[in-house]
Amino acid sequence: MSEFTLKTRLLAALEGKPVDKVPVCSVTQTGIVELMDEVGAAWPEAHTNPELMAKLAIANYELSGLEAVRLPYCLTVLGEAMGCEINMGTKNRQPSVTASPYPKNLDGAAVPADLLQRNRIPAVLEAIKIVREKVGPDVPIIGGMEGPVTLASDLISVKSFMKWSIKKTDLFEQALDISTEAAIAYANAMVEAGADVIAIADPVASPDLMSPDTFRQFLQSRLQKFSASVNSVTVLHICGKVNAILSDMADCGFEGLSVEEKIGDAAEGKKVIGDRARLVGNISSPFTLLPGPIDKIKAEAKVALEGGIDVLAPGCGIAPMTPLENIKALVAARDEYYA
C-alpha cells in the first residue's frame, strides 16, 4: 500500500522530492471527442457550462486513468475576459482568438476591476469547485491557462507583438506587465477555487516565434514574477524546440517544465535543467498519442521514464480525435515500467 495519494505523489514529483513511481497525467488540454460522447459533455458547450466542463475533465481521470483532473480546454478564457474576440470552435476544434483589443496602442488597456466576474472565468472557477466535490481531496486538480506572454500577444495581436518587441519596447513591456498582472489574478482565483497546480501554456514564448535574446531580456522576468506570485505549485509549458531557452526556463521559478518531443529525449532535457526544475512530458501528442499504435506509445513512454522524466505526460495538448485507448496505453506504460 503506497503512502502517496495521487495528489501528494504529483506534488512531491513536481517539487523534486522522492516518489514511489513517476506520476502520469496531462498538464495540457484533455478533452477528447470519444469522452465527450461517452459522458455527454461536448465542446463548445463544455467551455462555458461549468457542469459539463467538470464532467468532461473528470472523465479523462476516471476512464483513462490519468492521475489528475485538468481543466479547462483552451487558451482563451483570460484573453476573452480582457477584451479579445473569440471563435468558440467546434466539437473537435479548440476556441481561438480572432481579434485583439489593442493592436495599435495601449490606450485604455488595464486589468479590469471585475476581471474575475467576466465571461467564462466564473464558469471555470465553478467547474474547479464541482470537480473537487466529485473527486474528493486526494486527486490533484490542474488549472490550465494561457501564459502572460501569449496573453500579451492576444491583447495586441501577434503582428504588433513581434513589431513592438523590436521597435516599441516600452509599449511591449507595458503589454507584458498588464498581462502578467491579469494572469496572476486569474491563477490565484483558480487556486482559491481548489486547483493544486497551475499549468500555463505560453506558446508565443517559444524560440519558434521569439528569439532567445528577447526571452532573456523581456519575457523571463515576467514569468519569474508570475511563478513567484502564484500561491501553488506551477508548471510552465512552452511548445516547440525550446532547447535554446530550456536553461532560461529552468530559472523562471516554476516547479515543472512541460516540453514536447521536439527537445529530443528526456535525458538531454534533464541534463540541462539539473535540479532547478522538474521535467514534464514529452510524449508526442500529434505524432504518437493521436495515431498510435499502442506499442509505439509504450516504447516512447519507456524511453522518457528511463531518461528520468519526472512526470510522464503528453508533450502538448491532447488532440481531440485521440482514441481513449491510446491515453490508457500511456498509463499502462508507466505501470508496466514498475511491474
UniProtKB/Swiss-Prot annotation:
Annotated GO MF terms: [methyl-Co(III) methanol-specific corrinoid protein]:coenzyme M methyltransferase; metal ion binding; uroporphyrinogen decarboxylase activity
Methyltransferase found in the keyword field: yes
CDD domains according to UniProt: Mta_CmuA_like
Cofactor: how bound: Zn(2+) is involved in coenzyme M activation: in the absence of coenzyme M, zinc is coordinated by a single sulfur ligand and three oxygen or nitrogen ligands. In the presence of coenzyme M, one oxygen/nitrogen-ligand is replaced by sulfur, probably due to ligation of the thiol group of coenzyme M.
Binding-site residues, Zn(2+): 237, 239, 316
PANTHER family reported for this sequence: METHYLCOBAMIDE:COM METHYLTRANSFERASE MTBA
Keyword Transmembrane on entry: no
Domain of life (superkingdom): Archaea
Keywords annotated in UniProt: Metal-binding, Methanogenesis, Methyltransferase, Transferase, Zinc
Catalysis performed (reactions): methyl-Co(III)-[methanol-specific corrinoid protein] + coenzyme M = Co(I)-[methanol-specific corrinoid protein] + methyl-coenzyme M + H(+)
Organism: Methanosarcina barkeri
NCBIfam families, sorted: mtaA_cmuA (TIGR01463), MtaA_Meth (NF040654), PRK06252.1 (NF004889)
Name under which the protein is recorded: Methylcobamide:CoM methyltransferase MtaA
Top enzyme category: transferase
Family: Belongs to the uroporphyrinogen decarboxylase family. MtbA/mtaA subfamily.
